[in-house]
Amino acid sequence: MSRFFRRRKFCRFTAEGVKQIDYKDLETLKAYISETGKIVPSRITGTKAKYQRQLATAVKRARYLALLPYTDSHE
């Protein structure tokens, strides 16, 4: 018996019926990036493998076009 209620992971893209993840949709992409700028793994977010691959490609494209940072701001 666990002490804490763990929320069930689910794929947000499957639930919403998304066909393709857009690299220009920065609000969606920022939800899957840590504060240090790394892509959060699917075992933590619950994203299916198909959408995790699309997500990684979209984040890399957005980084290349300077829409997202590669790392956090070093202060």
Curated annotation (Swiss-Prot):
<dbReference type="InterPro" id="IPR001648">
    <property type="entry name" value="Ribosomal_bS18"/>
</dbReference>
<dbReference type="GO" id="GO:0006412">
    <property type="term" value="P:translation"/>
</dbReference>
<keyword id="KW-0699">rRNA-binding</keyword>
<dbReference type="GO" id="GO:0003735">
    <property type="term" value="F:structural constituent of ribosome"/>
</dbReference>
<protein>
    <recommendedName>
        <fullName>Small ribosomal subunit protein bS18</fullName>
    </recommendedName>
</protein>
<keyword id="KW-0694">RNA-binding</keyword>
<comment type="similarity">
    <text>Belongs to the bacterial ribosomal protein bS18 family.</text>
</comment>
<comment type="subunit">
    <text>Part of the 30S ribosomal subunit. Forms a tight heterodimer with protein bS6.</text>
</comment>
<comment type="function">
    <text>Binds as a heterodimer with protein bS6 to the central domain of the 16S rRNA, where it helps stabilize the platform of the 30S subunit.</text>
</comment>
<dbReference type="GO" id="GO:0022627">
    <property type="term" value="C:cytosolic small ribosomal subunit"/>
</dbReference>
<dbReference type="InterPro" id="IPR018275">
    <property type="entry name" value="Ribosomal_bS18_CS"/>
</dbReference>
<keyword id="KW-0687">Ribonucleoprotein</keyword>
<keyword id="KW-0689">Ribosomal protein</keyword>
<dbReference type="GO" id="GO:0070181">
    <property type="term" value="F:small ribosomal subunit rRNA binding"/>
</dbReference>
<dbReference type="Pfam" id="PF01084">
    <property type="entry name" value="Ribosomal_S18"/>
</dbReference>
<dbReference type="InterPro" id="IPR036870">
    <property type="entry name" value="Ribosomal_bS18_sf"/>
</dbReference>
